[in-house]
């Protein structure tokens, strides 16, 4: 069975992963068939680059992405695009849907960042209140 999975590269404490197509029996950093992308988890925001055409080819050939790679592919919108193609949509409809999807993802990202900053400020206020309350 062929898998699409991560292969670790980089150095100690600074991982960079290659998204590779490999036989399921080969070790994590062992022999692989093709490099189809990269993933940098230490970059802010996480950097994912993929070769969409090659991933589509390998998935149609029968390669199964691991759970982590599947979520990385999903963040790029490739799975949604493939689903639209399988539903028989035209290229114009697919491009319009993908634009809407990207806008929706940008809104979700902004909401997540706003919520994160709100929680951070609330935590700081609570700590400051506890510090001043503890002194009195």
Curated annotation (Swiss-Prot):
Gene3D superfamilies, per the entry: 3.30.1320.10
Keyword Ribonucleoprotein: yes
Region feature Disordered, mapped onto this chain: 113-136
Keywords associated with the record: Ribonucleoprotein, Ribosomal protein
GO molecular function: structural constituent of ribosome
Cysteine pairs bridged by disulfides in the record: none
Superkingdom as given in the UniProt entry: Bacteria
GO cellular component: cytoplasm; small ribosomal subunit
Ranges in coiled-coil conformation: none
GO biological process: translation
Basic residues bias locations: 113-122
Pfam families in the record: Ribosomal_S16 (PF00886)
Protein family (similarity comment): Belongs to the bacterial ribosomal protein bS16 family.
Name of the protein described by the UniProt record: Small ribosomal subunit protein bS16
């Amino acid at each position: 069975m062929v898998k699409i999975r991560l292969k670790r590269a980089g150095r100690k404490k600074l991982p960079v992963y290659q998204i590779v197509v490999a036989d399921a029996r080969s070790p994590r950093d062992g022999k692989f068939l093709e490099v189809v992308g990269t993933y940098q988890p230490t970059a802010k925001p996480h950097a994912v680059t993929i070769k969409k055409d090659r991933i589509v080819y390998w998935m149609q050939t029968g390669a199964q992405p691991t759970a982590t790679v599947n979520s990385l592919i999903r963040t790029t919108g490739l799975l949604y695009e493939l689903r639209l193609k399988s539903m028989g949509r035209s290229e114009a409809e697919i491009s319009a849907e993908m634009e809407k999807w990207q806008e929706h993802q940008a809104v979700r990202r902004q909401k997540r960042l706003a919520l994160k900053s709100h929680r951070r400020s609330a935590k700081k206020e609570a700590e400051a209140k506890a510090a001043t309350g503890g002194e009195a």
